[in-house]
Amino acid sequence: MRRRTLLAVALSATAAGALGAVGMTNASAATLDPNLPPGGNFDLSVWSLQLPVGSPGSPETISPARLKGAGGYTNPTFFWTDKNDGSMTFWAPEKGVTTPNSKYARSELREMNANGSAANWTLAGNHTLSAQLRVVSVTKNVAVGQVKLGTGGSSTKPLAELYYRPNGDIYFGTQNSPDASGQTLHKVGNVPLGVKWTYVINVNGNKINFTINGTKTTYTIPSAFNPYRQYFKAGSYNQSSSESTSNGAKVKFYSLTVQHA
């Protein structure tokens, strides 16, 4: 085991404990140091960071080498350690630089390999993203976790996205097919704004298992996705846009782990 931390009509929901058996964390609220940058509290050696600044269509990206460790990167506007609770904090405004295939700004981590190359894993095996977080503010909708399509075809869509809305509703969006633009939204919970909660996204063969606060839901991944490799993303990927730089989505993480087996 190495640590770096869909669509189906039928689904099942079962109770699971806390983060579940695979929900190990590399930091907890009790151990977070508010005086360290995020890389001092979290293992960011296997993540790069996309920011809502840069040139049009090319947001600034911070490498794992710059993020990791007690001397790691911090940004007082978009990516910092909360001085009160030590959380890794992401802010994505409504107006900001976006990637070529999106109209929304983000302050978001992208999974990488330990050697610095982009993570790009097959559906075979057991792949898990676990987090404890809380959404502090959001205008309309924010994606706080993703399973994104990598190589294997022309599509750049996500396989699945986890959304949080201002009323506390949490939705899991599953892509209908690699080439279709539509998602199917599944309501999977409700947590009031500002309250901590946990999620685990586990990809295991042709299944994707999603656990929120201990309740697990399983979806079958359509075979059309089999040629594609995947990678995880986590942070604040705002899902609304305007000319405002003061409105947006602020998300705080208290633990974040990636695990592959």
What does each of the following model-derived ranges do?
Residues 174-198:
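Short, aromatic/His-centered strand-loop micro-motif at the edge of beta-sheets
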Residues 131, 195-203, 208-210:
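Short tryptophan-centered beta-strand motifs in secreted/extracellular beta-sheet-rich domains
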Residues 212-215:
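Short strand-turn-strand beta-turns centered on an Asx-Gly dipeptide
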Residues 19-31:
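C-terminal region of N-terminal signal peptides and the immediate post-cleavage residues
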Residues 41, 126-128, 222-261:
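Ligand-recognition surfaces built from glycine- and aromatic
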Residues 70-75, 79-85, 89-169:
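Secretory/extracellular carbohydrate-interaction modules
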Residues 29-71:
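N-terminal module-boundary/linker segments of secreted carbohydrate-active enzymes
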Residues 3-7:
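N-terminal export leaders
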